[in-house]
Amino acid sequence: RTQDIARQSIIIASATFMLIAAAVGSGAFGGTSVSELQDGALSAQGSYLAPAGPAFSIWSLIYLGLIAYTVWQALPPQRADERQRAVGGWIAVSMILNGLWLVTAQFLSLPLTVLVIALLLATLARVIVILGRSRARTWPERIVVDGANGLHFGWVTIATVANTTAWFTQIAPAAWADQAEIWAVAVLAVVLVIGVASALVTRRIAPALATAWGLGWLAVGRLTGEPESTVTAIAAIIVAIVLVAAGVWGVLRRPRADIAL
């Protein structure tokens, strides 16, 4: 069907845009690196909820997974796949928004990056919901479809928190600085509730692992860098452990033949 070929082509184009935008937005062609954009608001020192620098290495794994997905979905057997018909367009949108965030951070304003990443998070949540309506038939599908998009969703969850907090840090009155740790712990409590609920409902491990990865490096950042906050670090570690436990518990509740990443 022409529509199926169009879907596959749009996904390829979206992945290409994402990779080009990632290169441009990260400063690979001579521009400013992400950590230096927006007056340093997006750096590891930008707020109490910013992960330490090594956390962002997860993007390499996410991009690799999305590239593998793009190649896999373009193969003839996937052309008329009903699962891909349902979710392919949404994954394409998520890749476009992924690239658009980097372009926005590089050339536009911090509030607009919050808008773009919120749209990206909502789109990825939609992807996870659609994937939950039917199960992957093979392990390659579990890895490149469920796994890659699950990692993307989990990481963007914590990235949205960091991005939004960076913006609030810039616009908040100076008097609020004394309550920064309290607000940080409160936000982490919200992440805990939403993350556990998501893990138990979706019964997936990849989102929990990616979010926990970010939280772990958030803790490292607060213990070894600025702004220093032992309280925030401890809270982040607790949330990370509970999220992984909830993810494992969710997966174990699935039938063996219905394991999802």
Question: How would you name each of these model-derived features?
Answer:
Residues 2-3, 75-76, 129-136, 247-261:
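Membrane-interface capping segments at transmembrane-helix boundaries
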Residues 13-21, 90-101, 118-127, 145-163:
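Alpha-helical transmembrane segments of multi-pass integral membrane proteins
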Residues 15-34:
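Alpha-helical transmembrane segments of multi-pass membrane proteins
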Residues 42-58, 143-152, 173-183:
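Short aromatic-rich membrane-water interface segments that cap or initiate transmembrane helices
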Residues 50-55, 175-193, 220-245:
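Membrane-interface transmembrane-helix boundary segments in multi-pass integral membrane proteins
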Residues 81-91, 203-208:
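Membrane-interfacial loop-to-transmembrane alpha-helix junctions, especially the N-terminal start
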Residues 100-114, 171-178, 199-202, 223-229:
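Membrane-interface helix caps and helix-loop-helix hairpins in membrane proteins
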Residues 206-218:
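Central hydrophobic cores of alpha-helical transmembrane segments
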